[in-house]
Every structure is written in structure tokens, then in C-alpha cells.
């Protein structure tokens, strides 16, 4: 059931911290209770609960509110947690030796480094499975809303989403590529899960087709901005993950240079802001959150 929510014009720091705490609390409740011999469960919890930005679930919650949605809190929160589980699973797999071969993630050893490759793979599969189960069991959502949410998330994971993006990155990333080819890889790797998050928010809010279209465009530009920021910070040592992972890869930073990439990033953010404003008529909390986050990150790059 959806009802009209009060207008959330801005997002205070306390409100953002409370939302983040709510996400972590619900994730903790939804994930398996850690047992002494349940190594896969422990790896699932480590992958999903390690301190992180929780950008995707935060955006889902904030966008739903800015669309005028007030739902059963746990129901909307469960959708947000499902998205975070998918994101965590993708990071576990991306970090594997056969892929990016990363040793550090969120300031901690990667899951395969800590638990072994076999446990890491199983934990990622279990997180993906759990995500869909969480949507199916979410309170306060109609069966149709759940079905549509499952469809959005499954599309974001598969060959039109994360899988395709990772494959393109692995198979083409070390070869010369055009800017257009790099942008397409970035779209699959990053934009698609943002798009699923936004569309899930619009489903719960029963948003208009026009608003959904604006949110789709917002997601495309936001995903590109995030990936460009990731490329710009690749050489930094305080990101919580391995530095110089893009050495020898065809990225826009290597192709165009940092200054041109930062300008492109700001252009994507401006377009994203315009699309978001057109979609959300009940508040600007999402806008405030995105702007504050990127301002902080770009200040460290400049």
C-alpha cells in the first residue's frame, strides 16, 4: 500500500545517518546468523555488512520518498537491502583472482582472500539467492509490485547488466577501445544496478511513466559519473580497495586525461540532476544526498 508522504525537501546529516543505520540493522536481521561452522554464512555477512557507502539502498529509499511514497517501512527497506545484497555479491565476484584479482575491499581483505575462493563463490551465489527471497517476503507490497521488482533486479544482474559489464571489462579492458565502447562497458557495470534501484522505488511509489523515464535517464548519467569517479581515484591509496587496478586498462582517464574526465563527470552530474528534478515532485532529499556525496569526493580528487 502506498500513501502520500510528507515533503522531504532536504536531507539532514542526522537523517542520512539514521537511514544508513536502518539499512545496516535490517541487513543484519536478514542475513544468516553467524555460526561457528557456517563459513559460507560468515562470508555472506562479511561481504554485505562490511562498512560501505550503501549508495544504492540509500538512493532507493530517498527516491521513493521524493516520489511521494510512504510505505510499510520494513517493506521498502527490504527492497533496499536486496539491492545491497546484489551489489555485495557482485563485488565478491569482481575481486576473484580470475577476474580483478583484488586483495582489499572496503578496507578489509577481500572475501576470497579471507575465506578461500570456493567459499567466496558460494557466498556470492547465496547472496543473490537471498536477495530475491527478501523481495518475495517483503511486507506491505502487492504481488505485482514484487514481481516487477524481481524483474528489474534480475535484468540488472544478467546479460543486460552486471554480467555483461564484467565480461566486457575482462575481455576488452586491456585492449585499445573508443570512448563509446568504454561508456557502454561503464553502463553495464554501473548504471544498470542504479536503474534497477530507481525503478524499484518508482514501482513502490506507483510513479507515472514519465517519472520512470526520467529516473531511467538519471540512472544512466549517475552510473557514468560514478564510474568516472572510480577511474579518477584509481591511483589513490585511501579508497579502501587496491590502488592502480586500472593500470594498463583502457579507461577514459587513460584515453582523455584526468581533467577532461572530471569535466565529463560534472556534465553527467548536471544531466542527472535535471532528470531527477523532473521525476521527483515531493522533495529533494535524493538530490541533496548525491550532490553532497560527489562534492566531498571531487574535493579529494582536485
Swiss-Prot record:
It comes from the Bacteria. Pathway: Isoprenoid biosynthesis; geranylgeranyl diphosphate biosynthesis; geranylgeranyl diphosphate from farnesyl diphosphate and isopentenyl diphosphate: step 1/1. Mg(2+) 2 binds at residues 94, 100. Mg(2+) 1 binds at residues 94, 100. Its EC number is 2.5.1.29. Keywords: Carotenoid biosynthesis, Isoprene biosynthesis, Magnesium, Metal-binding, Transferase. GO terms for biological process: carotenoid biosynthetic process; geranylgeranyl diphosphate biosynthetic process. Pfam families: polyprenyl_synt. Its cofactor is Mg(2+). Binds 2 Mg(2+) ions per subunit. It catalyses: isopentenyl diphosphate + (2E,6E)-farnesyl diphosphate = (2E,6E,10E)-geranylgeranyl diphosphate + diphosphate. CDD domains: Trans_IPPS_HT. Isopentenyl diphosphate binds at residues 53, 56, 87, 106. Belongs to the FPP/GGPP synthase family. PANTHER family: FARNESYL DIPHOSPHATE SYNTHASE. This is Geranylgeranyl diphosphate synthase. It comes from Pantoea ananas (Erwinia uredovora). The lineage of its organism: Bacteria, Pseudomonadati, Pseudomonadota, Gammaproteobacteria, Enterobacterales.
Amino acid at each position: 500500500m502506498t500513501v502520500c508522504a510528507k515533503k522531504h525537501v532536504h536531507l539532514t546529516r542526522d537523517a542520512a545517518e539514521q537511514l544508513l543505520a536502518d539499512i545496516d540493522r535490517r541487513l543484519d536481521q536478514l542475513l544468516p546468523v553467524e555460526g561457528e561452522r557456517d563459513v559460507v554464512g560468515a562470508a555472506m555477512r562479511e561481504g554485505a555488512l562490511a562498512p560501505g557507502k550503501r549508495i544504492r539502498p540509500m538512493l532507493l529509499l530517498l527516491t521513493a520518498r521524493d516520489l511521494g511514497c510512504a510505505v510499510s517501512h520494513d517493506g521498502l527497506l527490504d527492497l533496499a537491502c536486496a539491492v545491497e545484497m546484489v551489489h555485495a555479491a557482485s563485488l565478491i565476484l569482481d575481486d576473484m583472482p580470475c577476474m580483478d584479482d583484488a586483495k582489499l575491499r572496503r578496507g578489509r581483505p577481500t572475501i576470497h582472500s579471507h575465506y578461500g575462493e570456493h567459499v567466496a563463490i558460494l557466498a556470492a551465489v547465496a547472496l543473490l539467492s537471498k536477495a530475491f527471497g527478501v523481495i518475495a517476503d517483503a511486507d506491505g507490497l502487492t504481488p505485482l509490485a514484487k514481481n516487477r521488482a524481481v524483474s528489474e533486479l534480475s535484468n540488472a544482474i544478467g546479460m543486460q547488466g552486471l554480467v555483461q559489464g564484467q565480461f566486457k571489462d575482462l575481455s576488452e579492458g586491456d585492449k585499445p577501445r573508443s570512448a563509446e565502447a568504454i561508456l557502454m562497458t561503464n553502463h553495464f557495470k554501473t548504471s544498470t544496478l542504479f536503474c534497477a534501484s530507481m525503478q524499484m522505488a518508482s514501482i513502490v511509489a506507483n510513479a507515472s511513466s514519465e517519472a520512470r523515464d526520467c529516473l531511467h535517464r538519471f540512472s544512466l548519467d549517475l552510473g557514468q559519473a560514478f564510474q568516472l569517479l572510480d577511474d579518477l581515484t584509481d591511483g589513490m591509496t585511501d579508497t579502501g580497495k587496491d590502488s592502480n587496478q586500472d593500470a594498463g586498462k583502457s579507461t577514459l582517464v587513460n584515453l582523455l586525461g584526468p581533467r577532461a574526465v572530471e569535466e565529463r563527470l560534472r556534465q553527467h552530474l548536471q544531466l542527472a540532476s535535471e532528470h531527477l528534478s523532473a521525476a521527483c515532485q515531493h522533495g529533494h532529499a535524493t538530490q541533496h544526498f548525491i550532490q553532497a556525496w560527489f562534492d566531498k569526493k571531487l574535493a579529494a580528487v582536485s
